[in-house]
Amino acid sequence: MFENLCTLPLSSELFTQTLHPTEPILAVGLSGGHVHAFRLPVEEQELDEHGDADGNGSVLSTGTSTIETEWRTRRHKGSCRTLGFSGDGGVLYSAGTDSLLKAAASATGQVISKIRIPNSNTDALDPPTLLHALSPQTLLLATDSCALHLYDLRDVSSFKSGKPAQTHYPHDDYISSLSPLPPTEMSTSGFSKQWVTTGGTTLAVTDLRRGVLVKSEDQEEELLSSVFVGGLPARGKYGREKVCVGNGNGVVTLWEKGVWDDQSERIIVDGGGKAGGESLDSMVAVPEELEGSYGGKCVVVGCGDGSVRVVRVGGMKGVVEDLKHDDIEAVVAVGFDIGGRLISGGGETVKVWQEKVEDEEEEEEEEQEDIEDHDDDVIGGSGKRTLEKDSDDSDVKADSSDEEDGGRKKRKKKKRGKKGQVGNGILGFKGME
C-alpha cells in the first residue's frame, strides 16, 4: 500500500517524465519546452555495527529534506513531448514539437548532439510521440506520421545526419505506447530485440532485424498504454507472460505472449467496462519487492480523472488500491525509481509515493487492541453460544465476524489519519524559482 510522501510543483504542464536507471533522479519534460532534472530525497544511510554505510537508502518522511534541482533548461521550442535515459543513465534523450531529437549528458544537461526528425512524406515537421533507448546500440523514436524510426547509435555519422537505420509503420495511427519484450534465453547480448507497440485500435510486434512481425485485429477501442509482465501463475490455457494494455474506456486487456491476434482477458478498472470509463493513459509494472503487499503481480495505471490505481493482473484480478494524484488533470506518466517509490505525474505536479510502513508504536497499539478484542470474545462469547445452540448459531458467528471487521476498519481509519499528517505536505525545493 502506498502513501503520498510529497508533491513537486512544476512551472508548466507536464508532458513526459522518465527515471534514471541507477540513481534517484527524475527528469520531466514540460509544455513550455523546458526539461528539468531533480534529485529525489533519500534517507541518510544507516551505519552497520562496524560503522560502515549499508548502502540502502529510502525516502525521508520527516518533511525536512528537499528535492534538489540538478539542472533546468529550455530544451525545445514548443513542448517537450518525450524523454528517455540511456541504459546506463549517462545520456538523456529528448524530443519536442520542434521536430528535434537531442542527446544531453544527464549529469549536466549539456547537449552532446542533435538531429532533425525526418518526415518521409513531406518537408513539414514531424513531431515525436515517444522514444525508447532499446540498447546501447539502438534508439527507437515514434512520430505523429505513424513512423517508427530506428537509430543505430554505433554509427556516429548516421546519427548526426539524422538518417535512421530503419523506418517501420506498424500502425495506421500514431504510436501511443512501446513495451520491450525480454530477450530470449538464446540471446548473447542480453538486450531486447523485439517490442510491442499500440497505436489507434491495434497492437503490433516489431523485430529489430525482421521489421513488423504481426498486427492484431481491430479492437474497436483506443489502446493507450502498455507494459510487459512476466512470472504470472500458469492457469489452464493461459501462460506466464503477458502484455497488459490500457484502453480508452477504463479496461486493461491482457495479451498472451506469442498470441498477438487478439486479447485473451479483460480487467475492468473504471466505468463498469462500458463506454464512458476513464482512459488509462499510463502504465507501469509494480516491482517484485512490492508484490507481497498486493498478493500477486500488479500494474499501476494513471487515469484520465487524476486517479492512480493498482491493478492485480495475476490470481484474483481487479483494482486493489485507488490513489488520488489530482482532482481534474489526467495522470500522463507513472514510474518507479530505484528505491521502489512510485512517481506519478500530471497537470502541473509530480507526486512521490512510498510503501506504507507501520511504526513501532502503531504496531504495539494494534497488538494490544487485538488482545483486548480476543479477551472480550472469550469472556462474553461462551455464555451467548451456550444459550443459542440452535439454527441461529450461524447468525451469531456472522455477527461476531462483522464486529471484528468493524474493529479492523476503525483501526485502519485511525492509522490513515495519523499518517496523513506526514505525507500530504509540499517539501522544500532547491533551485525552484
Swiss-Prot record:
Start-end of the WD repeats? 9-48, 75-116, 120-161, 218-265, 275-321, 326-363
Please tell me where this protein is predominantly located.
nucleus
Renumbered to this chain, the Gly residues biased-composition regions fall at: 420-433
Acidic residues composition-biased segments: 357-378
Q: Return the Basic residues bias intervals.
A: 408-419
Keyword Repeat part of the UniProt annotation:
yes
The GO cellular component terms are: nucleolus
Keyword Translocase listed: no
Q: Which UniProt keywords apply?
A: Nucleus, Repeat, WD repeat
Under InterPro entries, the record lists:
WD40/YVTN_repeat-like_dom_sf, WD40_repeat_dom_sf, WDR55_POC1
Chain intervals with Basic and acidic residues compositional bias: 385-400
Give the record's family classification: Belongs to the WD repeat WDR55 family.
Query: PANTHER family given for it?
Result: WD REPEAT-CONTAINING PROTEIN 55
The entry's protein name is: WD repeat-containing protein jip5
